[in-house]
């Protein structure tokens, strides 16, 4: 979903604005939240170089992020985990920077105005295609494992 929506940015004459963000990036987050609510899972987007501090890596995410950094071919990791005392499985999926991502995550000085204004503490820039942008983290409680 993310790749398909981001591809709509390619070849644009004007820089992305808040409206484009709402059509390209926001739907991915909204879909993740909907799936999480529907199934009782926790779904997060996390990154070391985040735009929003709420998306900072936790200790487990930092460990998995280092694994992804060390092995560009590694796309996913499952771990036994617990959240707030609840045992379960945690699935991590890498987010790899694509050329279309550079419209907002490329050179610091080339970021769209809405990004600079909305995210004054932004650290999600100066990426290149193929870089690790971050990861999706999905926690599935044992009590829900195998249930659809």
Region annotations inferred by a language model:
Residues 1-98, 110-148:
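Extracytoplasmic c-type cytochrome modules immediately beyond a signal peptide or single-pass transmembrane anchor
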Residues 102-109:
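Detector for the c-type heme attachment site
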């Amino acid at each position: 979903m993310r790749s398909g929506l981001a591809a709509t940015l390619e070849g644009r004459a004007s820089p992305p604005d808040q409206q484009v963000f709402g059509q390209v990036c926001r739907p991915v987050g909204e879909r993740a939240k909907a799936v999480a609510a529907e199934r009782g899972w926790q779904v997060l987007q996390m990154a070391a170089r985040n735009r929003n501090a709420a998306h900072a890596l936790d200790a487990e995410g930092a460990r998995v992020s280092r694994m992804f950094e060390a092995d560009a071919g590694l796309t996913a990791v499952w771990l036994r985990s617990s959240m707030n005392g609840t045992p379960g499985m945690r699935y991590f999926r890498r987010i790899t920077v694509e050329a279309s991502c550079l419209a907002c995550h490329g050179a610091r000085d080339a970021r769209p105005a809405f990004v600079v204004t909305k995210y004054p503490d932004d650290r999600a820039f100066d990426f290149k295609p193929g870089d690790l942008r971050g990861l999706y983290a999905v926690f599935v409680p044992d009590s829900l494992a195998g249930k659809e």
